[in-house]
Amino acid sequence: MHRDILFLLKHDFPDGPGAAYYCPECAQLNGVLACYPQLRHVLDVRYVDFPRPRAEILSLIGEANQSCPVLIIADGPPAHVRDVELPTVNGLHFVAGATAIGNYLSQVHGVGRPH
């Protein structure tokens, strides 16, 4: 991997009868990407389907960590990153959840941070 990979759920997914759904945390990060379009040049943003298993994520960080949003760190986290949980699976560090990912992106790429 050369760039960090940000996995987000595709919007308008079915989950039973009724209207389609979207993932609120993924929508939040789509907003961050809209506010800071330069992030799309430094991240590999991938949209995955809602149903599990999510094979692409599973192959990298295992079945237990296939929730979205998740950011897979390409070359290990920079030493200056603070107050962000960075678990490791299969030798890969990752960040889970919109707020944690937002804090990581702020520290690493100099964009605004979640309030």
Where are these regions (language model features)?
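GST-like domain detector, emphasizing the conserved glutathione-binding G-site
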Residues: 1-115
